[in-house]
Amino acid sequence: RDSSTSRGLGDVYKRQEADLYKNASYIITPCGAPEDKIEILANLARKIGFGTVKITTPEEHDRMIAFTSQLPHVLACSYVMSPCCPNHKGFSAGSYRDVSRVANINSQLWSELFLENREPLITELDILIDNITKIKDAIKAEDRETLAELLEQGHKVKTALGE
């Protein structure tokens, strides 16, 4: 087995779910591996049910994992740390559930993941904090126009993605 081209599929051998990876993404960071080996791995991933196979650099992988996975966990944990959280029942519905869902984490594991990917995660945190600060400042200044522009900017980004 050539360790430069072999990558694990997580806990697939521990799980009994037939469609565990159905339509999930499989990310390959070739790191100089031969193209034919990369294609074999990509085809294997597709055959076992992965919906998307993404070939990328380690740097882009780390940036995108910071944004798509780690940042939402930071956001969710920060959100539920509000003193309002214990009293949310009767007031909350889908928005609370959507934002807070990923706060239910293994804190030791995620601490390790955050620290291993700290630079890209810090960059994403800085961007999020900047965006939140802009919205906060517009609310504080009672600047309806700026606030609406910021909210519309987020809406346009999400809509352009077709989501």
Model-derived segments and their meaning:
Residues 5, 19-20:
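Structural alpha-helical scaffold elements that stabilize or flank donor/cofactor-binding regions
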Residues 156-163:
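Short, charge-rich amphipathic alpha-helical segments embedded
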Residues 2-13:
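Single conserved hydrophobic/aromatic residue that forms the stacking wall/gate
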Residues 87-154:
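Interdomain hinge/lid region at the active-site interface
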